[in-house]
Amino acid sequence: MKLSELFNPNEFAARHLSFGDEAALLEALGEKSMDDFVGNTVPQSIRMPSELNLPEALTEADALAKLKGIASKNVINKSYIGLGYYPTRVPNVILRNVLENPGWYTAYTPYQAEIAQGRLEALLNFQQVCIDLTGFPVAGASLLDEATAAAEAMAMAHRVGKVKSESFFVDARVYSQTLDVMKTRAKYFGFELVVGDFAQADEGEYFGALFQYVGKDGDVQDLQDVIGRLKTKGTIVAVAADIMSLVLLKSPAELGADIALGNTQRFSVPMGFGGPHAAYFAFKDEFKRSAPGRIIGVSKDASGKPALRMALSTREQHIRREKATSNICTAQALLANLAGMYAVYHGPEGVKRIANRIHALASTFADALVSDGLNVVHKVFFDTVTVDFGSKEKTDQVFAAALESGYNLRRVNDTQVAAAFHETSTREDLVDLYRAFTGKDAFAFADDVKGRLNAELLRQDDILQHPVFNSYHTEHEMLRYLKKLEDRDLAMNHSMISLGSCTMKLNATAEMLPITWAEFSDIHPYAPEAQTAGYRELLADMENSLKAITGFDAISFQPNSGAQGEYSGMLSIRRYQEANGEGHRNICLIPKSAHGTNPATAAMLGLKVVVVDTDEHGNVNIDDLKAKAEQYRDVLSAIMITYPSTHGVYEEGIRDICRIVHENGGQVYMDGANLNAQIGIMQPAEVGADVLHMNLHKTFCIPHGGGGPGMGPIGLKAHLAPFAPGHVVTDMHNASADQTAVAAAAYGSASILPITWMYLTMMGKQGMEQATRWALLNANYVAKRLSEDYPILYTGKNGRVAHECIVDLRPLKAESGITETDIAKRLMDYGFHAPTVSFPVAGTLMIEPTESESKAELDRFIAALKQIKQEVLKVERGEWPKEDNPLVNAPHTASDVTGEWAHPYSREEAVFPLPFVREHKFWPSVKRVDEVYGDRNLVCSCLPTENYED
């Protein structure tokens, strides 16, 4: 034997892909080799002129060791910077059983409610926390970050308000990053932002106003009077409130506000260099149909049992397109679940103890400084003590002394320093900080602490009284509660999830491990640059890899979702055109097949959408494109194009599409939703795209988290790079530094980037090329097998599809009355999550198997759909009544088949329709959910007590 052959750097690719299936899959397609297959599937006109320029693969162990070396270059100081980001403790029972558990992190957004009741309940808990702490009756299931939530509040205030004004007031005490994002949004909405003293907010005419509660420098102001004065004018008032402070302070609703928003990071979500974190968004009941983002609501199932679902979806971009309330798809479900479970585990007394401890430590520190003669700026505060030293020299000295002791403070200005206390602060920290501020070694602090919050500011009402927050305070009980919820959800640790345009591939364990390393999770986004060398090396590595893959000249990591990536890409185009005297260009061409985020994003940037027809094959109609590009050539801004198309086909005319738009003065934005069919085969920049967004949570293995987090970085050509998002606080050392931001943190959800780094490093050049080929191979195998029973709606060259295929159910529906929804629900009885339903074509299923599914799993899925076809035929032939058959009654629960049975089909046909199902059985916890009832009777708070008695 040869020693060199016993070391296999490509071992991970063999775990990610099923190499042993290659011959059988190719044979089924009538192909002799993988190269022949790719040649017969991908148009030669789009192929890359050179090989993929990535390093060779490393083993799992070597990749982890290399990443550990990079991570170790980050310095973990004790962070007292604040500004919306604070050290926190993730209870280990939540860390291990939610954040590190594939049963939670590999699930998709809960579109199929019957197999998502666990995380729906967890998100309902999160909403209840937000409802209790803000005092409003309705809260959403998270937004991307606090700054985005503030921008959404501004837009919502304009939608629902009655004041005839285009001006919005912003409290000068809001976080700088929040104001930065609001400036970006306000410009293209045509709003004027007026920043000023909170107490003078009522001196102008504003459609809306935003106040910070607690202020960025730590002060807590009584906002009740100024809010009252604004309300008499009809102004819609939003309050950005620190979630931990609301445990003690009066709620925003009690202050008289209309909307409350903020970050829930303090409830057990690590700082992670800025994200991901779940923002909260709560509001008055009358605004619920104008609110952004997901809302979980209580409905009932077919048996009348309470059941949860995503409510009021008609507000959203996939339905309302350019008229949507927001371009947001999904936000931060996994992080919202962490925050909600933090409240479940600690309960009302636990969170009060934590909030009081934070406040007591800050108050004790302030008292000691005052007794030592120092000037504490604010007399009323929650957690942040700001001291004015009167000179820059003294400020520098204190800042340096703290740094030398391992503490990061915030320099407010030349004479002021702030220290923000938090959940992990200790009495030992008090001594160290006192020494840094005074130069004295120690002080004696009393056990009895007089807080710095005035009595009239304190909350009088009870919080977290629901049984869910008062039942699981021992670890055993919490563990079992989490397991009970997990068992109600079908995630990728049970079976493949073939959602088209979603790329539900393997999220390997080795990829996930580093996100909980303290070197990544415990870094404040505004930590001194000398302490973040590891992150900067990680970002540089990632930028080089993504540039090599896509062909672009620059990468921006700031967008913290795919929708934000779209917005950032189109924003860069708008800024570029304005800088070149072409700000009048306001027409955006969008193909008829596009995802709803595309027109919603265009509308948010003040663009008018012109729809381009598609032909009978699903491709962009080149003649119609040419006619419209020429018609609008003087005002054409851009085209938004997805590639391969949303119909799952490589359009041979993509170079012509780009050329036509460029010839008529426009730019090409490429939607990267389908990038999984491009890597190593083509480069979007090379075929003519000017900017592309990439979904790291699709193509590059960041898990979907049951509805977030995601990352949507953009690749840009050199001419657009100076117009990518910048940041007001963080020096990004790039050409776009002076631009305003799209997200709160400069690098978005930076702490989940190690997942993608690990994927790229373990796959290497060869593995990444193979992954794309396997994605195509699996999709075409599924399409070929299913074409024996169902029409495949669109195909390209040689009858091939790209990485996904669309199964047309309309002929079956016309003959049998069985709908695409019936088939989607019936798949649950076979143990599978449905593919994408009725997108991009109504009455269809769009299937994307990804590269990481084995032939055995594909065959089970195919067998399920083939058997369902036979079931539909039984209905068609009259063997089963149209109103009583396994399809219209799906899904079937354990309660169904153990109770009375009067159906014309057997219990076995209901729940074990094929032999493999017995070994792979997943039991939905509710019957089909009544969508209409849930919207007509909206309840988005926790269920009554009796529902928790099991």
What is each stretch, according to the model?
Residues E31-S45, A257-G262, A689:
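TRNA-binding/sensing appendages of the translation machinery
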Residues G140, V170-A172, F211-Y213, F389, ...:
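Short glycine-centered, acidic/aromatic-flanked micro-motifs in structured strand/loop junctions
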Residues M1-A28, G39-Y80, R89-Y105, Y111-Q117, ...:
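Non-catalytic terminal extensions of PLP-dependent enzymes
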Residues A13, G118, T148-A307, L369-G373, ...:
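Conserved PLP-enzyme active-site core in the AAT-like
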Residues A139, E192-G196, V377, R410, ...:
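General small-molecule cofactor/ligand-binding pocket signal
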Residues V269-A282, E286-F287, A331-L335, S425, ...:
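Conserved phosphate/anionic-ligand binding catalytic regions in large, soluble enzymes, centered on
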Residues V129-A150, K164, F168:
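A conserved hydrophobic secondary-structure block that centers on an alpha-helix together
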Residues M154-K162, Q332-V344, I752, T756-T761:
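Proline/glycine-anchored alpha-helix kink/cap motifs
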